[in-house]
Amino acid sequence: MKVQQYRLDELAHLVKGELIGEGSLQFSNLASLENAEVNHLTFVNGEKHLDQAKVSRAGAYIVTAALKEHLPEKDNFIIVDNPYLAFAILTHVFDKKISSTGIESTARIHPSAVISETAYIGHYVVIGENCVVGDNTVIQSHTKLDDNVEVGKDCFIDSYVTITGSSKLRDRVRIHSSTVIGGEGFGFAPYQGKWHRIAQLGSVLIGNDVRIGSNCSIDRGALDNTILEDGVIIDNLVQIAHNVHIGSNTAIAAKCGIAGSTKIGKNCILAGACGVAGHLSIADNVTLTGMSMVTKNISEAGTYSSGTGLFENNHWKKTIVRLRQLADVPLTQITKRLDHIQAQIESLESTFNLRK
């Protein structure tokens, strides 16, 4: 199969960059500085990568004007303000897209479902009653859409995804393999030593330009809906419980868990393995560092941490012993000791005239 080639001047135009060098050069792909060959385009995202750039074999470089001055031995450049953003834009040029349309013969689709003529429905897909699939949407093999599910335009639903609970997806949503959208929320009423299941009557609403990774679970609401606003991005292995509301452009990394009825604001970042307790509210523009555990509301923007960083093993054991000892001492006793030490320091300063 012939590999698609793109001219350097065409690529520069796509990112609104300034071309320096030979615009007719042909490129077959993007590549890292380390592994690029003469038919590859690469990018330099900061001065710390200049040493690699100087020895790279790439045919052309996406750089800022300032970085170009450090590469006099190179000939071909696309000059932009943000090389990383330009790289992100060009990945879509070289990405291998699915161009098929139509419905595979092994798919099973309810007669009441409305499927766009420009959509693609893969092998063994099951689509239930009153479902809607929009223009140019791709649904890969073995995926299931239960009754009353709606999927908008230009979406990509990977293999083995289940969308249930009358969930509604807007446009340009991407969902990767083995994720479940709209599954039953974890709701039970305790009574006389037993758990009594609560039927989950809500749904899941997903906005435009949302990306959800593989093996995620996003549960439908008990009464109100679980909501992901526009631009939310979610890594693999994330659990979002019923009635959660996630604000626009929030990013959630792998292995995070968000308990029910919590509201997370806009433009937040949850790094890997964060946990958020239920019925909480997190303000806009909050960043949680890795392994943080949120147990109370966060009302102000900022960066918050509670995860413990790595220690050498013996150091860790000593630290834990000290923490346990500290926990055994009443806070009032610690305060009295600190007050006593402070009084002694002030007395010494006064005696020896140490204060300035």
Swiss-Prot record:
EC number(s) from the headed UniProt entry: 2.3.1.191
Protein name: UDP-3-O-acylglucosamine N-acyltransferase
Top enzyme class: transferase
PANTHER family (alphabetical): UDP-3-O-ACYLGLUCOSAMINE N-ACYLTRANSFERASE, UDP-3-O-ACYLGLUCOSAMINE N-ACYLTRANSFERASE 1, MITOCHONDRIAL-RELATED
Example GO biological process: lipid A biosynthetic process
Taxonomy, superkingdom: Bacteria
Catalytic activity reported: a UDP-3-O-[(3R)-3-hydroxyacyl]-alpha-D-glucosamine + a (3R)-hydroxyacyl-[ACP] = a UDP-2-N,3-O-bis[(3R)-3-hydroxyacyl]-alpha-D-glucosamine + holo-[ACP] + H(+)
Oligomer and partners: Homotrimer.
Species name: Acinetobacter baumannii (strain SDF)
